[in-house]
Amino acid sequence: MNELKTKFSHKLQRFWAALLDIFGPRKVAVFCVVILTVMMLVLTISVRSCSGIGGSGGNNTDPAISERDTITSKVTGKQLPKTASGLKNEADRLAASYDYDKALALVAEYESAYDNAEDCSAYKQELETQKAQCSRWEDTTHVPHIFFHSLVADTDRAFDGDGEEDGYNLYMTTISEFNAIMEQMYARGYVLVDIHDMVKQVKTDDGKTVYKQGDIYLPEGKKPFVLSVDDVNYYKYMTDGDGDGYADAKGDGFAHKLVIGKDGKVTNEYYEKDGTLVTGSYDVLPLLEDFIEKHPDFSYRGAKGILAVTGYEGVFGYHTHPDWKKKLTSDEYNKEVKQAKAVSEAIKKQGWTIASHSYAHFGYGSADAYKLVDDVQKWEDQIQPIVGDTDVLIYPFGEDIAGVEDYSGAKYKSMYDAGFRIFCNVDASQDYWVQIHDSYVRQGRINLDGYRLYHSPDLIKNLIDAKTVIDSARPTPVPSI
């Protein structure tokens, strides 16, 4: 054996001597580095190919994936990579939003793609354990509903001492305040739910379909809430400084439109003070999307908020009101409508609900039945074809058509016949107010605006600490109502 080793050693020495003689020391050194690099690359690929869901075993985990290495999941409808890591990332995201059943279904859908069944089994057990730690929310009539108007993006322009300042100071919230509110509610264990999660429709023994309390399952310490935004129309008095009907930098520092960004997600258009037109997160929708992306456990099964729109100035910042047919060419007007429809579809695809905020924005409670019926009809004729069907009506000025008594009469019949089943007023006197009737649902909403933050911090102390939220750029004292 020693003799063989000696012979091999002599041959190896002669081999290296020949290489050095032919190529020189520098080239031989480069050659050695290349050989070592290739060996390390091969070793790395081999290790990755053995990584499964739990970190060992399984195939198809190379992160460099081509289009043919993806699959459209029947569970989520998303295009996902056919890799263990891709599966786990998506399943983890679903589990983080408390959608354990969908996460388990996704694992089952992909399970056959992996060699290591033991790792799949362990991961499924982990999901089952998390699911078991959730319990049904005891009473969905105990769910608060907070709301905002369009957010102040530029406090210098909004609070500039003109005739609109007091209104903005009373009824608007700044971006800084909104972000702080979301952070505090998240820290306190609040979880955003869809308003439809609060209820479910069931059939009775006599064949009737009625509303009952919904099934919301959350871990201990978590509590549900609903969020809505009023007047997501981007009215011209807020965005058009020179009065020509189009948004400009002379506006009062608000976003002026919802658009579909390059990534396919809904975002804002906004004019900077210097006239630069930009897109980004300047209002509730994209800001909340950003927050949920960072904190997926803030959203229950992908729930988002409600956007309430009127009709007298078009929707989402687009010139869809019939009066614009006189000012635009047919092609220009049709383009506005088409874009507004596309944005509406994208909004709903992202998990948001679009609600009616009336057509002309007057108090439904104090109006006579004839005026209300006409308003509902205008909504159906002009706005519903753009935003689609909705069963949620958010009362303008928060003015309900009744007190605590049951709905009845021509006003209710008109709204019911138009498809509305969930009705939201404003009631900040208590943490929550919900009525669930056989054929409709009512919920009170709490305004988190300048007036509420400044004048009634004790009424919202279970939600936030208003004193630490209020923006230093907000003029004080905030006017009284």
Please provide the spans of the model-predicted regions.
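Hydrophobic membrane-insertion alpha-helices, especially the h-region
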Residues: 31-45
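Membrane-interface motif at the C-terminal end of an N-terminal transmembrane signal
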Residues: 42-54
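N-terminal, intrinsically disordered, polar/charged segments of Gram-positive cell-envelope systems
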Residues: 51-136
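Functional beta-strand-loop-alpha-helix junction segments that form "active/interaction loops"
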Residues: 199-204
